[in-house]
Amino acid sequence: MKKVNLLAAAVLAAAFAMPAQADYTPNAYFGGFLRTGVQSKSLFADDAEKAHLGRLGYEPGTYGEIVLGTDIAKVDETVWSVSSRVGYRADKNWDWYTQNDSGSHIAFREYFLNVKGFFDFDKDANIWTGKRFYRDDTYVNDLRYYDLSGLGAGVENISLGEGKLSLAWLRRDESRDYLWDSTVDASYVATDTDGKRLDKDGKVKSFGTVNFLDVKYAFPVWDGGNLQLRHTSMIPHRNSDSYFEYAHAEHDYKGAQRYSVAFNQGFSLGWNKTEIIYDHGSNVNWGAFGNGGWIDPSGCSNKAYRWSLFNFGVVNFTERFGLAHNLYMTYSSGYDNTINSTNATDKKSDKAFQLTLRPFYQLTKMTKLELEGAFYTHTTKSYFKNDANDAWAGTKNSNAQGQKLSLAYVISPDASNFWSKPEIQFFVTYLHGNENGLEFSEYGSSAYQIHVDSASAPVIHEGTKTTNTVIFGVHGEAWW
């Protein structure tokens, strides 16, 4: 029997398939995001710090995304497309900044396949699989408070009654360190000089899997009003290598549940969103300004809970004057504080309040003034231990606070529209905090430590922490 050439067969099959798509011109698209600029001091403010005090006049460094995508096939009313996104971040103002330099990062953020129109009963529904963004955020503070981004698959916008249903399964492989568990014998877990977890063969084993099962249903309630109900189940799964170690561990970490109710309201003056989130389980310990998608491997958060409230939007009071706002409150408790237990934690509860107000006033067709004021307070109640009695001696509170005031002269294509991009901001910013708050030293949180070499050994003298500063600069932002 004559052998079939697989390549020839594939080419022949493609040729026969071409007539179904012969009249279709693919739709290619190019998009992206950019923020960059220069300022008088290098504060190295990361995303978490912006979440505390807002974006305006407080975004050093460069960040960008390039989006490339195209429709690759169409059969009847079904369209197949691919989309990709590459992200770049640079923390320092260097001319030649490579991947080998600290603070420079390139990441493949999205790469997924989408099919629209496959279901005869609902041509607007989508089927997707691959790596993609799956998150909600507050623009003014850049807080990605609901972030499940990763590899996955799902269906979106399925018509159900008056609303739309979306289902998704996403998975992350994240580092997991079990060294906190003293019941794991040293013969099973060892560390190298950098403290990384090694197996008995000297290989690093530090990954575990978290599966996210997400369901959301959005439906209209009245003119301009939309309600979304959402539930996410977070299920951790250890890889096979980890079972060897964890068979000798006293405690395990469990999954988590997240429930959300979000209400969007559009009206003649603008738009507003209010969302309430309840978390229960091992994702609670991400802290007040995290995203709720991180699973605490220590086991101390298995029974913890967190309530969070978000309210943000934009209101145009007149043709020239408007206000963008962001309000956030959160409270968590229920941590395991068992003495002589390897999953003991000293945290009892934490609570936070954050408010950002950004009024803006249009000067001309392409210019406006923006003034952003922000405030946050974050209090953590912790147990402190009586070593002599091996028990908790009581509780103490630690409070972090910060304030920011930024004034910016902004140029954009349409200064009457808050969302108009691209824009260039000429800004001056005043930052203030307390001793437990954010660090405003020019070169980051380690800058206020002075290292002095003595004859015997290096000595570290801790200087005065910078709790207030003034910066000025020019910042640009664009999306397309």
Short names for language-model regions:
Residues R144-A262:
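Aromatic- and glycine-enriched pocket-lining scaffold segments that form the walls
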Residues G117, W180-D201, L363, T377-S406, ...:
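Outer-membrane beta-barrel transmembrane domain signature
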Residues T36-S42, V86-K92, K131-R135, W169-S175, ...:
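Transmembrane beta-strands of outer-membrane beta-barrel pores
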Residues Q39-F121, F133-Y146, Y178, K196-K203, ...:
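Surface-exposed loop and membrane-interface regions of Gram-negative outer-membrane beta-barrel proteins
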Residues L213, A218-S406, I411:
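Detector for outer-membrane/organellar transmembrane beta-barrel domains
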Residues K2-V4, A8-D122, I127-W128, E156-L165, ...:
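Beta-barrel outer-membrane channel/assembly domains of diderm bacteria
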Residues T25, G57-Y63, G103-E110, R144-G150, ...:
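Transmembrane beta-barrel outer-membrane domains
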Residues N27-Y29, Y63-E65, S81-S83, F108-E110, ...:
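Extracellular structured ligand-interaction cores
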